[in-house]
Amino acid sequence: MRRPLIPLVLSTIAAQASIVVLVPIVVEVGRDLDASVSAVGQARTVLAVTAVVAALFIGPLIDRLGVRPLLGWGAVLALQGAVLSAIAPNLPLFLGASVVTGTGVACLLSAGFAGVGAWFPEGEMARPMGFVVGAQSVSWIIGNPIIGIVTDAVSWRLAYAVPGTICLAALAAALLSPVERDAAIVRPAGEREGLRAVFQDRSARRWTLAELVAYSAWTAELTYIGAFYIQTYDVSETTVGFLLAVGSVAFAISTLSTASLTQRFERRRLIVSAALGMGAMLAVIMNVTPAVVFTLCLFFGMALMAGIRSTASSGLGLDQLPAQPGSMMASRTASAQLGYMFGALIGGLVLAVADFGELGFVLLAGMAVSAVLVAGVSDPAASGSPRGSAAGASSRDPRAVS
C-alpha cells in the first residue's frame, strides 16, 4: 500500500468506527443512563445531522488548505467525541458528545475521499478509491465484534477505546503523511467553491442526488435486515451479526476489484448496472424466502454490487469538479448522512403500514431512480463525453507521490 493511501484508509476506518460503535452498546448505554433504547439511538441522528451541516463548511476548507489538515482535525475531533461519550454521566451530555463526533466524522470522510483525487494522478485513482471505500467495512467486520466483547467483559464506556485508538492511528498517519499540501491542484480564479459550486453544476448536482437516493435505499435495507432475518427465519441476534459480517466481507472484496472492472467496462454503465442489480436483489431477498442460506447468498451478491457501485460512483464524483475534490466529497458525505436518516425513516414508514415484501419493492424503485440519475451524469473518462476534452486539460496536473 502506497504511503499516501495509509492516512486516507485509516481516516475512513476511524469515521466508520465512530459511527457504528453505538450498534453493539445501545442497550447497555440505555441501562446505565436510565434511558430508552430509542432515546439513546438518537445519538446516531445527532451525529448525522451534525455531519451534514459540517460538510457545508468542510468542502471549501479542504480545497483551500489541503487534505492533510482536515484529516488531522477530524481525527482529533472524533477522538474527543469518543472520550466525551465514554465519560458522559447522562443522556443529554451523551447526545452532545455526538455533535463533536459528527464534526470529526464529516472531516474524516470528506478529506479521506477527497485525498484520492488530490494525492493521486488522474487515471490512477480507481484502485486507491477501492481501498478507501472498502476500508469502511473493517469496522463492521473487526471493530464491532471487539466492541461487543469489551462491552460484555468490562463496560460500554471502555468500548469507546476502540474508535478512540483508531482515531489516534489516523491522526499519527496524517501527521506523518509524506504529502505536505495538494499544490498540484490549481483552481481557476473566481471559481465558486463548496456545495454552491456542486449544485450550480448540472452533472455534479445529478450525481449528488443519485448518491442521496442510493444511500437512502441501501441504509433502509441495512437498518431493517436484522429484523427481517429474525422475523422471517427465527434466528438469534448472534447469527444475525454473522450474516451481516458476510455482507461486509463481500463489500470489501468488490471494492478492491472495481478498478479492474472500470478498465473493462464503461464506468457510468457499470454504476447503473450495479444499482439496478442491487434493487432487483433487494426485491427478491424480501419476497422470496425459502431458506436462510438462499437469502444469505443473495445478500452476498447484493453486497458485491454495492461495493462496485459505491467505489465507481465515488470516482465519478471526483471527476465532476476535478479542481475541487473537497467540495465534491463533502457533498458525498452530506448525501450519505442524509441517506442514513431518510432510509431509516422511509423504511420505518413502509413497515408501519405494510411488510418486508413491500419494502423490497420500494427499495427497488429507489435504486432504479438512482440509476436513472447516474445515467445523466457526465463521465470525463468516457469517450465522447461532453467533458472529455475538458478533463484532458483540467486543472489537475500530472503528479506522482512516492
What are these regions (language model features)?
Residues 53-89:
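Conserved MFS/SLC helix-loop-helix module at the cytosolic interface between two early adjacent transmembrane helices
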